[in-house]
């Protein structure tokens, strides 16, 4: 399985899910995949491989120890939310459509309640990336591991030398699940200034802090609901209210830095 646990998702997904559950419990949302390589063609085998991995998502479990880890580390979200998440039917295959269009380009849409559908994105993306790599013959067993690890160590050494703090945000763009494990193992062992991991599964596996707060998608949703004039302000206001000022890293580049800073002065 490419996705190994119900905890293998990015931190900000639980934050945004909880916000939407509190503010828009009945709102339905549609996500649409956009390949940033327009014109790239796939075959039916790729579609079947995607569907197989998507089917496996519904089989994922969240163990009691993982849930306890999440309750402790997501201290700004009430514990009952993770009790709900442990048993919720998040990855219902009836919510997703995958197909090839008339140009053999990959298409994917997911529709469900907003606080559920958000989890799909950062599982679909690593599945797509790994299967695409396999389709092109780029697999872990064929890579030059020593050369690749040397590149990782160069970045770690740079961080250590200059005391540069960083977080690991590799899930959505990773080469493969096995490779993320390898990289995170080295970061854990050698990096002095890694402050956290956005992949909760990896953070739990390695005993790291979780890292991350929100994504552009939440501002996009608010702008769709309230319009551009009010959406940014409402998003920041609700975020601060729901989390009582915690989870306080806010994105300022969705509609422009000047507009974002202006909205902060009116809270």
Where are the language model's segments positioned?
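Catalytic core of soluble alpha/beta enzymes
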Residues: 236, 242-267
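Ordered alpha/beta subdomains of enzyme catalytic regions
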Residues: 1-231, 240-241
């Amino acid at each position: 399985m490419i996705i190994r646990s119900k905890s293998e998702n990015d931190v900000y997904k639980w934050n945004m899910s909880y916000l939407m559950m509190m503010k828009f419990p009945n709102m339905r949302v549609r996500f649409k995949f956009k390949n940033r390589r327009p014109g790239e063609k796939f075959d039916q085998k790729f579609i079947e491989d995607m569907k197989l991995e998507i089917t496996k998502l519904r089989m994922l479990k969240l163990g009691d120890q993982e849930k306890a880890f999440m309750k402790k580390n997501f201290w700004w979200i009430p514990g009952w939310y993770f009790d709900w998440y442990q048993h919720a039917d998040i990855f219902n295959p009836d919510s997703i459509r995958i197909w090839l269009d008339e140009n053999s380009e990959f298409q994917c849409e997911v529709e469900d309640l907003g606080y559920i559908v958000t989890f799909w994105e950062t599982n679909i993306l690593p599945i797509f990336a790994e299967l695409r790599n396999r389709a092109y013959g780029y697999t872990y067993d064929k890579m030059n591991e020593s050369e690749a690890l040397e590149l990782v160590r160069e970045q770690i050494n740079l961080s250590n030398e200059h005391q540069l703090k960083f977080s690991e945000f590799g899930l959505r763009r990773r080469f493969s699940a096995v490779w993320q494990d390898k990289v995170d193992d080295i970061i854990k062992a050698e990096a002095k200034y890694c402050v956290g991991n956005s992949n909760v599964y990896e953070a739990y596996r390695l005993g790291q802090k979780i890292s991350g707060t929100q994504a552009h998608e939440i501002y996009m949703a608010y702008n769709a609901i309230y319009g551009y004039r009010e959406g940014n302000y409402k998003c920041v206001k609700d975020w601060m209210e729901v989390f009582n000022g915690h989870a306080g890293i806010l994105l300022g580049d969705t509609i422009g830095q000047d507009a974002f800073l202006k909205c902060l002065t009116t809270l």
